[in-house]
Amino acid sequence: MIEPFIYPVATLIAGVDEVGRGPLVGAVVTAAVILDPARPIVGLADSKKLSEKRRLALYDEIVEKALSWSLGRAEPDEIDQLNILHATMLAMQRAVAGLHIAPDMVLIDGNRCPKLPMRSQAVVKGDSRVAEISAASILAKVTRDREMTELDREFPDYGFAQHKGYPTAFHLERLAALGATEHHRRSFAPVRRVLAL
């Protein structure tokens, strides 16, 4: 049983989540969403627990109904320079900065917050407990999955559309056989090993 979340007192709450910390390739993508209480969205949940079809339908509904939404990202070279944690925090800051309405409270999935110019609170399992974070997780996941499908067209031998860049056995085998693309994260151990050969 997931513990229900008690919302802080605030006028405009943004939810923030990230997708893509674990993959060996591509950007880490974040989203920030301020929902409109007058236009509720039914069925918001952690993006990982939704079917792709449901995620896509909710993505369109969130984009249409949210008071404000924004995407942020950190590219592979930034991940390599900063490390994945700091790059994720930077991408979250970018998502919040991109909102055209400034929230007075930001709820962030996980156990730590980036430095922000407004109040913020980390919420463990927030993508299952907080509607705004669920919405952000859906926007971030759909966006990153689409990017991996695009990358798959550019590099069809790696299987990016299937594994989304995560270190599956197939991805590791392709990496060993073909080498790293320019989009691979060079600081991640499996990529580093291939580059050292």
UniProtKB/Swiss-Prot annotation:
GO terms for molecular function: manganese ion binding; RNA binding; RNA-DNA hybrid ribonuclease activity. Its EC number is 3.1.26.4. Its cofactor is Mn(2+); Mg(2+). PROSITE patterns: RNASE_H_2. SUPFAM superfamilies: Ribonuclease H-like. It catalyses: Endonucleolytic cleavage to 5'-phosphomonoester. The keyword Translocase does not apply. Manganese or magnesium. Binds 1 divalent metal ion per monomer in the absence of substrate. May bind a second metal ion after substrate binding. Keywords: Cytoplasm, Endonuclease, Hydrolase, Manganese, Metal-binding, Nuclease. GO terms for cellular component: cytoplasm; ribonuclease H2 complex. Pfam families: RNase_HII. GO terms for biological process: DNA replication, removal of RNA primer; mismatch repair. Residues 11-197 form the RNase H type-2 domain. HAMAP family: RNase_HII_B. Belongs to the RNase HII family. Endonuclease that specifically degrades the RNA of RNA-DNA hybrids. This is Ribonuclease HII.
